[in-house]
UniProtKB/Swiss-Prot annotation:
It comes from Klebsiella pneumoniae (strain 342). This is Cell division topological specificity factor. NCBIfam families: minE, PRK00296.1. Prevents the cell division inhibition by proteins MinC and MinD at internal division sites while permitting inhibition at polar sites. This ensures cell division at the proper site by restricting the formation of a division septum at the midpoint of the long axis of the cell. It holds the Pfam family MinE. HAMAP family: MinE. The keyword Cell division applies. The lineage of its organism: Bacteria, Pseudomonadati, Pseudomonadota, Gammaproteobacteria, Enterobacterales.
Length: 89
């Protein structure tokens, strides 16, 4: 019976395929546009606080916000600190 279903089944029409692809694209863009408007200012404020204590290059600070499962947000902060004189060989 499965063999008969295989030969008699109709292929998906192009409209349905296009709709599925469009839904995937929209979902990907929503995930990428989830960055809140306050994130650049937050990065600037964090950089100012760090610079009070350590001289660093602003490019060495990375702030990212990741959203998971709709109600969970993860703020990731990466700071590359310069080597201190004591730790150099």
């Amino acid at each position: 019976m499965a063999l008969l279903d295989f030969f008699l089944s109709r292929k998906k029409n192009t409209a349905n395929i296009a709709k599925e692809r469009l839904q995937i694209i929209v979902a990907e863009r929503r995930r990428g546009d989830a960055e809140p408007h306050y994130l650049p200012q937050l990065r600037k404020d964090i950089l100012e606080v760090i610079c009070k204590y350590v001289q660093i290059d602003p490019e060495m600070v990375s702030v990212q916000l990741e959203q998971r499962d709709g109600d969970i947000s993860i703020l990731e902060l990466n700071v590359t600190l310069p080597e201190t004189e004591e730790s150099k060989p």
